[in-house]
Amino acid sequence: MNLEAVKHAASLNEWSGLIPEIALGCLALLLLVVEMVLPKKRHDLIATIAIIGQFGILGWVAWDFHSPFLGRNDAFSGLLQFSYVGQAMRVFFLLSSIFVSILARVSLAKQQLPRIEFYHIVLVATAAMMLLAQANHFVLFFVALETLTVGLYILVSYFRTSPLSLEAGLKYLIMGALSSSLLLFGIVLLYGVAGNPALEGHTADPMNFAALTRFLALNPDNFLAAAGIVLVLSGIAFKIGAFPFQIWIPDVYQGAPTPTTAFLAVSSKAAGFAILLVLVNSVFGPYWWLVQPVLVAMAVATILFGNIAALTQHNVKRLIGLSGVSHAGFLLIGIIASHSVPSAVGAVLFYLFAYLLATFAVFGVMAHLAGADDAEQELDHYAGLAKEDPFLAAILAVALGSLAGIPPLAGFMGKLFVFIAAFKAGFYGLLAVAIVGVVISIYYYFGWIKAAFFETWTPPADAVNPRPARTPVGAAAGVALATLALCSILFGVYQGPLGAWLLAR
């Protein structure tokens, strides 16, 4: 994109389509300025400014949801495609960043660590994810993805005095570099093949999704293109935590700060699915003969591995990480079905929103029960929670029930919509595996609920009370947790216009 293209975009007022992303960047810079201006004892206001600013940007996206740019795939010289799915993901990522910021107020205070940089990185990473969901070009896709990834490298190792956090950061860095290498190598192969003048339909812009799709449709059996697609798919599989690229999840989820773990579990995973949804219905389409069996095998292995591995976990952060692997498998079913069933796109979006509500509620409870070293959170620590803090116990029960897919909660409806789409697409074997996965997941989710409601905490004989002291629930956190739980119930009982709109996408 050269200077003339920038001027052309300005003349068409295309920059106004990026107001939310630009506003997030400006808000991130504002936080740094406020840090220099405010006295140190007033730095607590910075978190409030960040949260209020994000609510303002969310309000703008909601007000401008039916943007005049919707449907265009040539914005910024073809880098961006504004769509309703992209708008929905904008809302998703803003909600995620708001809840992460609220969690950070609770969690970071225990470690006595700088907070301004945390909010700054979250804002920049959120802007990158919003661009990623609207990418129509591999250049923007890769730049946005790496901007997100670099921010996550820092956030994962944010507890610089914790060996587990530093270890998690190093593991995530190594695995992230590997996945980026696979992804970039795949993009290079596609770029080289589609720009080859000796092949039919070669294009001058082989990294544009639309141009690349047209080329691949004319060359549906090119070996190098097939290899490139598999490598790109492998790079994305790392982000969503799909088998066999989920190996980093348990250790990284345990060692990272709780707000960062929530950010990884929800936002980063959703960003991967957002771009995968675009690619499956564009670039990967002509090679569906290859992509479908790969995704089907990946979905089956992801569901079974995630659920079976979670059965043996006692650390709740590792448990929620491995259960998130199984949810990636369920979402892959929706992605596969979306190639032939249009309503599957809405089913995936609804599942993601239901997953957001339940997962952030669980992490909100975890943040209040964790001590200074929040990597050591065991199921035993939740024993007697219903008696000691009925509010947190109720939130936890609703959230885990939704993740397990228990009616009438939003998680149940999300799974139901995805399963219906898979049934319409004829993937009956996948449905059978998914049902087995749901049954297995009920065991460990309800084991967690059982500990909170039906067990009593008994300190071990070799320690007075190794269980960390619980943090009182503040007003902002209490409202956020109650909202998450109530919305999980509401969207399970009544989807209304929102559900109808999502399923019409």
Swiss-Prot record:
The chain crosses the membrane at residues 18-38, 45-65, 84-104, 116-136, 138-158, 173-193, 223-243, 271-291, 292-312, 319-339, 345-365, 391-411, 429-449, 473-493. Disulfide bonds: none annotated. It holds the Pfam family Proton_antipo_M. Its main location: membrane. It catalyses: a quinone + NADH + 5 H(+)(in) = a quinol + NAD(+) + 4 H(+)(out). It is an enzyme of class 7 (translocase). One of its GO terms (biological process) is ATP synthesis coupled electron transport. InterPro entries: NADH-Q_OxRdtase_suN/2 (IPR010096), ND/Mrp_TM (IPR001750). It is found in: Cell inner membrane. GO terms for molecular function: NADH dehydrogenase (ubiquinone) activity; NADH:ubiquinone reductase (non-electrogenic) activity; quinone binding. Its EC number is 7.1.1.-. GO terms for cellular component: plasma membrane. Keywords: Cell inner membrane, Cell membrane, Membrane, NAD, Quinone, Translocase, Transmembrane, Transmembrane helix, Transport, Ubiquinone. It is a multi-pass membrane protein. Coiled coil: none annotated. Belongs to the complex I subunit 2 family. NCBIfam families: NDH_I_N. NDH-1 is composed of 14 different subunits. Subunits NuoA, H, J, K, L, M, N constitute the membrane sector of the complex. NDH-1 shuttles electrons from NADH, via FMN and iron-sulfur (Fe-S) centers, to quinones in the respiratory chain. The immediate electron acceptor for the enzyme in this species is believed to be ubiquinone. Couples the redox reaction to proton translocation (for every two electrons transferred, four hydrogen ions are translocated across the cytoplasmic membrane), and thus conserves the redox energy in a proton gradient. This is NADH-quinone oxidoreductase subunit N 1.
